Regions:
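Conserved helicase motor
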Residues: 55-61, 135-139
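A contiguous loop/helix-start segment that scaffolds small-molecule binding in enzyme catalytic cores
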Residues: 155, 159-268
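Glycine-rich, flexible N-terminal cofactor/catalytic loop recognition
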Residues: 1-58
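Loop/turn-to-beta-strand initiation segments
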Residues: 2-4, 74-78, 155
Length: 268
Protein backbone atom coordinates (compact mmCIF):
# COMPACT_ATOMS: atom_id res chain seq x y z
CA UNK A 1 0.00 0.00 0.00
CA UNK A 2 1.33 3.44 -0.94
CA UNK A 3 2.19 5.92 1.81
CA UNK A 4 3.09 9.47 2.67
CA UNK A 5 6.60 9.63 4.11
CA UNK A 6 7.37 12.61 6.35
CA UNK A 7 11.13 12.95 5.96
CA UNK A 8 13.53 15.05 8.01
CA UNK A 9 16.41 16.66 6.12
CA UNK A 10 19.62 18.41 7.28
CA UNK A 11 19.36 21.85 8.85
CA UNK A 12 22.73 22.93 7.45
CA UNK A 13 25.24 20.13 7.02
CA UNK A 14 24.36 17.80 4.13
CA UNK A 15 26.12 14.93 5.92
CA UNK A 16 23.39 14.92 8.58
CA UNK A 17 20.98 13.10 6.25
CA UNK A 18 20.14 9.63 7.60
CA UNK A 19 20.60 6.40 5.68
CA UNK A 20 16.89 5.71 6.03
CA UNK A 21 15.99 9.15 4.68
CA UNK A 22 18.17 8.59 1.60
CA UNK A 23 16.71 5.15 1.07
CA UNK A 24 13.19 6.58 1.31
CA UNK A 25 13.81 9.56 -1.00
CA UNK A 26 15.36 7.27 -3.63
CA UNK A 27 12.42 4.86 -3.50
CA UNK A 28 9.40 7.19 -3.67
CA UNK A 29 7.67 8.35 -6.84
CA UNK A 30 7.11 11.97 -5.81
CA UNK A 31 8.85 14.36 -3.41
CA UNK A 32 6.87 17.37 -2.20
CA UNK A 33 9.32 20.22 -1.47
CA UNK A 34 8.86 23.59 0.19
CA UNK A 35 11.18 25.08 -2.46
CA UNK A 36 12.21 22.76 -5.30
CA UNK A 37 15.27 24.87 -6.18
CA UNK A 38 16.54 24.76 -2.60
CA UNK A 39 15.92 21.03 -2.22
CA UNK A 40 17.72 20.22 -5.48
CA UNK A 41 21.06 21.00 -3.80
CA UNK A 42 20.47 18.11 -1.39
CA UNK A 43 18.76 15.78 -3.84
CA UNK A 44 21.35 16.24 -6.61
CA UNK A 45 24.17 15.74 -4.10
CA UNK A 46 22.78 12.29 -3.28
CA UNK A 47 21.59 11.48 -6.82
CA UNK A 48 17.88 11.39 -5.94
CA UNK A 49 15.80 11.34 -9.13
CA UNK A 50 12.14 11.40 -7.98
CA UNK A 51 9.67 13.85 -9.49
CA UNK A 52 9.49 17.08 -7.48
CA UNK A 53 6.35 19.02 -6.61
CA UNK A 54 6.30 22.47 -4.99
CA UNK A 55 4.30 22.26 -1.75
CA UNK A 56 4.27 25.35 0.46
CA UNK A 57 2.00 27.41 2.73
CA UNK A 58 0.35 29.16 -0.24
CA UNK A 59 -0.87 25.95 -1.94
CA UNK A 60 -1.16 23.46 0.94
CA UNK A 61 -4.80 22.51 0.39
CA UNK A 62 -4.89 22.50 -3.41
CA UNK A 63 -1.58 20.68 -3.82
CA UNK A 64 -2.36 18.47 -0.85
CA UNK A 65 -5.49 17.16 -2.56
CA UNK A 66 -3.45 16.19 -5.61
CA UNK A 67 -0.79 14.49 -3.52
CA UNK A 68 -3.32 12.49 -1.51
CA UNK A 69 -4.93 11.40 -4.77
CA UNK A 70 -1.56 10.24 -6.09
CA UNK A 71 -1.04 8.14 -2.97
CA UNK A 72 -4.52 6.67 -3.32
CA UNK A 73 -3.61 5.84 -6.92
CA UNK A 74 -0.65 3.81 -5.69
CA UNK A 75 2.26 6.24 -5.75
CA UNK A 76 4.53 6.73 -2.76
CA UNK A 77 5.04 10.37 -1.81
CA UNK A 78 7.64 11.96 0.49
CA UNK A 79 7.37 15.44 1.94
CA UNK A 80 10.46 17.45 2.87
CA UNK A 81 11.09 21.09 3.77
CA UNK A 82 14.04 23.39 3.20
CA UNK A 83 15.54 22.18 6.49
CA UNK A 84 14.54 19.99 9.41
CA UNK A 85 11.24 18.23 10.00
CA UNK A 86 8.09 19.00 8.01
CA UNK A 87 5.12 20.30 10.03
CA UNK A 88 7.34 21.98 12.67
CA UNK A 89 7.23 25.71 11.84
CA UNK A 90 7.15 24.53 8.22
CA UNK A 91 4.56 23.15 5.77
CA UNK A 92 3.41 19.57 6.24
CA UNK A 93 0.78 19.41 8.98
CA UNK A 94 -2.10 20.09 6.58
CA UNK A 95 -1.03 17.27 4.25
CA UNK A 96 -0.56 14.82 7.12
CA UNK A 97 -4.01 15.74 8.49
CA UNK A 98 -5.60 15.19 5.06
CA UNK A 99 -3.97 11.77 4.82
CA UNK A 100 -5.14 10.79 8.30
CA UNK A 101 -8.69 11.86 7.51
CA UNK A 102 -8.72 9.86 4.26
CA UNK A 103 -7.21 6.73 5.78
CA UNK A 104 -3.92 7.13 3.90
CA UNK A 105 -0.90 5.60 5.63
CA UNK A 106 1.68 8.03 7.02
CA UNK A 107 5.21 7.06 8.05
CA UNK A 108 7.76 9.35 9.68
CA UNK A 109 11.45 9.27 8.80
CA UNK A 110 12.91 11.48 11.55
CA UNK A 111 15.82 13.83 11.13
CA UNK A 112 17.42 16.95 12.62
CA UNK A 113 15.34 19.61 14.34
CA UNK A 114 16.82 23.04 15.04
CA UNK A 115 15.16 23.69 18.42
CA UNK A 116 16.22 20.32 19.87
CA UNK A 117 19.78 20.82 18.62
CA UNK A 118 19.80 24.31 20.17
CA UNK A 119 18.76 22.98 23.59
CA UNK A 120 21.49 20.33 23.42
CA UNK A 121 24.28 22.75 22.45
CA UNK A 122 23.30 25.78 24.56
CA UNK A 123 23.98 24.56 28.08
CA UNK A 124 20.55 25.57 29.33
CA UNK A 125 19.47 23.32 32.21
CA UNK A 126 15.88 22.14 31.91
CA UNK A 127 13.58 19.17 32.34
CA UNK A 128 11.21 20.56 29.73
CA UNK A 129 10.64 23.56 27.51
CA UNK A 130 8.02 25.38 25.46
CA UNK A 131 8.56 25.78 21.71
CA UNK A 132 6.71 28.67 20.05
CA UNK A 133 8.40 28.81 16.64
CA UNK A 134 8.17 32.15 14.83
CA UNK A 135 6.20 34.91 16.54
CA UNK A 136 3.56 36.73 14.45
CA UNK A 137 4.40 40.15 13.01
CA UNK A 138 1.32 41.90 14.39
CA UNK A 139 2.04 43.49 17.76
CA UNK A 140 -1.30 42.59 19.34
CA UNK A 141 -1.00 38.90 18.44
CA UNK A 142 2.62 38.84 19.58
CA UNK A 143 1.76 40.37 22.96
CA UNK A 144 -1.15 37.96 23.40
CA UNK A 145 1.09 34.93 22.80
CA UNK A 146 3.97 36.15 24.94
CA UNK A 147 1.71 37.07 27.85
CA UNK A 148 0.49 33.46 28.05
CA UNK A 149 4.03 32.19 28.66
CA UNK A 150 5.59 35.01 30.71
CA UNK A 151 5.16 33.07 33.96
CA UNK A 152 6.47 29.78 32.55
CA UNK A 153 9.23 28.28 34.70
CA UNK A 154 10.67 26.30 31.77
CA UNK A 155 12.67 27.83 28.90
CA UNK A 156 10.71 29.25 25.97
CA UNK A 157 12.18 28.69 22.50
CA UNK A 158 11.67 30.84 19.41
CA UNK A 159 12.77 30.77 15.79
CA UNK A 160 13.85 34.26 14.73
CA UNK A 161 14.72 35.76 11.36
CA UNK A 162 18.00 37.72 11.59
CA UNK A 163 16.41 41.07 10.67
CA UNK A 164 13.87 40.62 13.50
CA UNK A 165 16.36 39.57 16.18
CA UNK A 166 16.80 42.75 18.22
CA UNK A 167 13.16 43.76 17.89
CA UNK A 168 12.04 40.31 19.03
CA UNK A 169 14.36 40.45 22.05
CA UNK A 170 12.91 43.84 23.00
CA UNK A 171 9.33 42.61 22.58
CA UNK A 172 10.04 39.60 24.79
CA UNK A 173 11.71 41.72 27.47
CA UNK A 174 8.68 44.03 27.64
CA UNK A 175 6.48 41.08 28.63
CA UNK A 176 8.89 38.65 30.33
CA UNK A 177 11.17 41.15 32.05
CA UNK A 178 14.92 40.62 32.00
CA UNK A 179 15.98 36.99 31.47
CA UNK A 180 19.08 35.10 30.44
CA UNK A 181 18.91 34.29 26.74
CA UNK A 182 20.82 31.87 24.52
CA UNK A 183 21.16 32.84 20.85
CA UNK A 184 22.04 29.76 18.80
CA UNK A 185 23.08 30.64 15.28
CA UNK A 186 23.88 28.71 12.08
CA UNK A 187 23.45 25.32 13.78
CA UNK A 188 25.56 22.58 12.04
CA UNK A 189 26.98 25.16 9.61
CA UNK A 190 30.49 26.60 9.32
CA UNK A 191 29.83 29.59 11.61
CA UNK A 192 27.80 27.77 14.28
CA UNK A 193 27.81 29.73 17.54
CA UNK A 194 26.02 30.27 20.86
CA UNK A 195 25.84 33.73 22.43
CA UNK A 196 24.72 33.84 26.08
CA UNK A 197 23.48 37.24 27.22
CA UNK A 198 20.42 38.84 28.81
CA UNK A 199 17.41 40.54 27.28
CA UNK A 200 18.21 43.87 28.94
CA UNK A 201 21.67 44.18 27.32
CA UNK A 202 20.89 42.26 24.17
CA UNK A 203 23.29 43.04 21.33
CA UNK A 204 23.64 39.80 19.36
CA UNK A 205 24.65 39.99 15.73
CA UNK A 206 21.79 40.00 13.21
CA UNK A 207 22.84 37.30 10.79
CA UNK A 208 22.20 33.63 10.07
CA UNK A 209 19.43 31.23 11.02
CA UNK A 210 18.63 31.77 14.70
CA UNK A 211 17.11 29.80 17.57
CA UNK A 212 16.53 31.91 20.70
CA UNK A 213 16.14 30.20 24.08
CA UNK A 214 14.80 32.40 26.89
CA UNK A 215 15.22 31.01 30.40
CA UNK A 216 12.10 30.33 32.43
CA UNK A 217 10.88 32.52 35.26
CA UNK A 218 12.71 31.93 38.54
CA UNK A 219 11.29 31.96 42.03
CA UNK A 220 12.92 35.32 42.72
CA UNK A 221 10.67 38.29 43.48
CA UNK A 222 9.25 40.09 40.48
CA UNK A 223 10.56 43.70 40.54
CA UNK A 224 7.29 44.85 38.98
CA UNK A 225 5.46 44.04 42.20
CA UNK A 226 7.45 46.80 43.91
CA UNK A 227 5.52 49.28 41.76
CA UNK A 228 2.06 50.56 42.55
CA UNK A 229 -0.75 48.53 41.00
CA UNK A 230 -1.40 51.48 38.66
CA UNK A 231 2.20 51.54 37.40
CA UNK A 232 2.26 47.75 37.18
CA UNK A 233 -0.80 47.88 34.91
CA UNK A 234 0.65 50.75 32.86
CA UNK A 235 3.82 48.71 32.26
CA UNK A 236 1.84 46.05 30.42
CA UNK A 237 -0.64 48.41 28.77
CA UNK A 238 2.22 50.50 27.37
CA UNK A 239 3.79 47.35 25.90
CA UNK A 240 0.64 46.76 23.83
CA UNK A 241 -1.23 44.33 26.07
CA UNK A 242 -4.98 44.91 26.20
CA UNK A 243 -6.67 45.78 29.50
CA UNK A 244 -8.17 42.34 30.11
CA UNK A 245 -4.81 40.60 29.64
CA UNK A 246 -3.00 43.21 31.76
CA UNK A 247 -5.48 42.79 34.62
CA UNK A 248 -5.12 39.01 34.52
CA UNK A 249 -1.32 39.21 34.50
CA UNK A 250 -1.04 41.76 37.31
CA UNK A 251 -3.54 39.86 39.44
CA UNK A 252 -1.54 36.66 38.96
CA UNK A 253 1.80 38.28 39.75
CA UNK A 254 0.45 39.96 42.90
CA UNK A 255 -1.79 37.09 43.98
CA UNK A 256 -4.78 39.45 44.06
CA UNK A 257 -8.41 38.92 42.99
CA UNK A 258 -8.83 39.93 39.35
CA UNK A 259 -11.84 42.10 40.19
CA UNK A 260 -9.75 44.19 42.59
CA UNK A 261 -7.14 44.84 39.91
CA UNK A 262 -9.88 45.51 37.35
CA UNK A 263 -11.34 48.25 39.54
CA UNK A 264 -7.92 49.92 39.58
CA UNK A 265 -7.64 49.54 35.81
CA UNK A 266 -10.92 51.42 35.36
CA UNK A 267 -9.33 54.50 36.90
CA UNK A 268 -6.47 54.66 34.38
Amino acid sequence: MAKLYVVGTPIGNLKDITLRALETLKSVDVIACEDTRHSLALLNHYDVKARLVAYHKFNEKECGERLVQEIEDGKNVAIITDAGMPAISDPGAVLVKMCRERGVAVEVVPGPTAFASAVAMSGVICDGFTFLGFLPDKKRLKVSILSKYASSTVPVIFYVAPHDLKKTAKDIEEIFGDRKVYVCREITKLHESVTITSLSVFDAEERGEIVMIVEGKTEEDNPLTDMSIEDHLRHYLDSGMDKKEAVKKVAGERNLPKNDVYQVALTL
